[in-house]
């Protein structure tokens, strides 16, 4: 599928057309501007029609071999005789056969018949019990034979050097099938990618084991290292002004000044002394 898309992109790049243009030639344009030059050995105006032996392939394999197109595909192909001395073409394919339907239609160019258009339907299986499919082909051949096949005459298997074929699926089943195939491939790729990942059950969740913060706040840490001054009993005097101290002194008698002195140290008993 990727190769087919790449060929389409290459052909579109060679065409160098503005966005929005599509290749939808008429019957007359196909015969006059593509089939006639190719049968005469001249190059086609644009390289968007692949050359292959179409009758060696099943129709659903041909879109991958086309150079251009998404819903209809164009091919140049030789055509062989079914029998060496007959004029009937060999319509056998890889796993089935093409069966003509309806009458031949002339393709006019400048008021003259330049080619013949034939419609064919693909049957899967062997004739006459093949199963009809939705694959349709329009085959264009020149009204006047020429080239090496005509020169070979009777007895040669080659009936036409080149005919031009337009292939499409009546119900567009091929495009739907390709869309389903791409979806399945995408799902398979996603599943394969998922299998290569580490199962979530084996993934250690770092959030389940948060790192412990052993650091202390800066202020608390500094306070813990610095020695602390013990509170003194006369610290309350340090906060008083001179006027307050003078006023306090005038109120107190000399014998009461002892209250301003610090209390006597507590008498301590030596360790091990008996308790009475």
Swiss-Prot record:
One of its GO terms (cellular component) is nucleus. Residues 17-170 form the NAC domain. SUPFAM superfamilies: NAC domain. Expressed in leaf blades. Keywords: DNA-binding, Nucleus, Transcription, Transcription regulation. One of its GO terms (biological process) is regulation of DNA-templated transcription. It is found in: Nucleus. GO terms for molecular function: DNA binding. Its main location: nucleus. The keyword Hydrolase does not apply. Induction: Induced by salt and cold stresses. Induced by dehydration and methyl jasmonate. The NAC domain includes a DNA binding domain and a dimerization domain. Probable transcription factor involved in stress response. This is NAC domain-containing protein 67. It comes from Oryza sativa subsp. japonica (Rice). The gene is NAC067.
